[in-house]
Regions:
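Conserved N-terminal phosphate-binding loop of PLP-dependent enzymes in the Aspartate aminotransferase
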Residues: 1-414
Length: 414
């Protein structure tokens, strides 16, 4: 048995579904074969073949919460580009803004009229008074950690086991049998990341306090909810104690909301009254157009300005040529003003809550040892009987064969 399902039945189901998938998608199969001539493994980016299906699904178009592949199959899209299109594909306001800006140029490495409006909207929605724009949350997190180390003059950061903050090197540490290590799957890693990063379990306040007591932690970088390792919700007192402990030890708190923007208007931070020093969000922040934002308190911004003014000539390690480009700013303005609205959040919540309840009912009726976790409009089924408390429990809940069978079965069901 695996997750309450007999293994022989599971494997037979997956084999049948793979045959159904392949037979129904000749155009995707042909494009996959053609792409293998020039693209590594036939895809532009390795994540596109994370799921072991016969060949990748090639997409023709998407709108709202629907996706249509090149063979004409239409899907109810619950993935939404791994949340990059969290508020729906091709939101009309964003499409119009991008189309209009495209006529005026994509990038100038100079601000446009949209820049001050984007800044004002970010302040109004998310609360922090000073902002910077990047292309991805990986970039924004990397820059934020560099700022934190520069202004605290401390060398290390702290992450939670099972976290995800993009491909920021320092965050790729984990606990293995209770001891920290660099994640073994990293390619080309030449530095022991444990030297620069501490790692503790999510919800483990005692371990957090012990690491912070060392006095050399510049910044704790935290998702409000662990979301890339199943879904792990915080204990009721976790965030208040995290904030208290970081302040007590002179450590900055960076909240990465890239995966929890679904929580409600202003993200998890506004909904649950968190109080970070630095706040980062990417993916869906500009409707799926590459963009990320980094907000900071007035104190952090003042220290950042001073550090920039005092540093020797040369690259600061912060910024990229295309960061804050004209197209990104146009998409950000439209998405912040017209898509990330209280009314749209209310509509998403109104659909998500009954869906989560219905899925929970189906799981219970089938007597499966699974449960549903929800963060606002984001829902996940977790292959464990009860809510998870940390990254180690979340890793154990990844039942790979069952997940793979569910993935292809649901694809074939649309």
């Amino acid at each position: 048995m695996l997750g309450g399902v007999a293994l022989d039945r599971l494997r037979a189901f997956r084999s049948e579904q793979e045959a159904v998938y392949a037979a129904a998608r000749p155009q995707s199969a042909a494009l996959a074969a053609e792409a293998r001539d020039a693209l590594v493994n036939g895809v532009p980016m390795p994540w596109m073949i994370d799921w072991p299906i016969p060949f990748p699904l090639f997409i023709d178009h998407a709108e709202g919460a629907s996706l249509t592949d090149v063979d004409g199959h239409r899907y109810a899209d619950f993935c939404l580009g791994d949340t990059g299109a969290m508020f729906g594909h091709a939101a009309p306001a964003v499409v119009a803004a991008v189309a209009a800006q495209a006529q005026r140029g994509f990038t100038h490495m100079l601000p446009t009229r949209d820049a001050p409006i984007v800044g004002r909207l970010l302040v109004e929605i998310f609360g922090l008074p000073a902002w910077q724009i990047a292309l991805t949350a990986t970039d924004a997190n990397r820059f934020a950690l560099r700022i934190a180390r520069a202004i605290t003059r401390r060398p290390r950061i702290l992450v939670f086991n099972g976290c995800y903050h993009g491909t920021v090197d320092e965050t790729f540490v984990e606990l293995h049998d209770g001891a920290p290590r660099t994640r073994p799957g990293l390619l080309g890693q030449f530095v022991d990341l444990v030297q620069g990063a501490a790692v503790v379990e999510f919800n483990d306040l005692s371990a957090l306090a012990a690491e912070l007591a060392s006095g050399d932690i510049a910044c704790v970088i935290a998702e409000p909810v662990l979301t890339n390792s199943a879904m792990v919700l915080p204990d009721p007192d976790f965030h208040a104690e995290l904030r208290r402990l970081t302040r007590e030890h002179g450590t900055l708190l960076l909240v990465d909301e890239t995966h929890t923007l679904s929580s409600g208007f202003g993200g998890y931070t506004r909904v649950h009254a968190l109080d970070p020093d630095i706040w980062v969000c990417g993916k869906a922040i500009a409707g799926g157009v590459p963009a990320a934002v980094c907000g900071m308190t007035a104190d952090v911004a003042a220290c950042y300005r001073a550090a920039l003014a005092a540093k020797p000539p040369g690259h600061s390690g912060i910024g990229t040529t295309l960061g804050g480009n004209a197209l990104t700013l146009a998409a950000l303005r439209a998405n912040l003003a017209d898509v990330l609205t209280p009314a749209n959040y209310a509509a998403m919540e109104a659909r998500a809550a009954p869906l989560a309840d219905a899925l929970s009912g189906i799981i219970a009726a089938a007597a499966l040892p699974w449960h549903i976790a929800r963060v606002g409009a984001r829902i996940e089924f977790v292959l464990a009987p009860a809510p998870l408390r940390n990254g180690t429990e979340a890793a154990a809940a990844h039942l790979v064969e069952l997940e793979q069978a569910l993935h292809i079965g649901l694809l074939n069901q649309g």
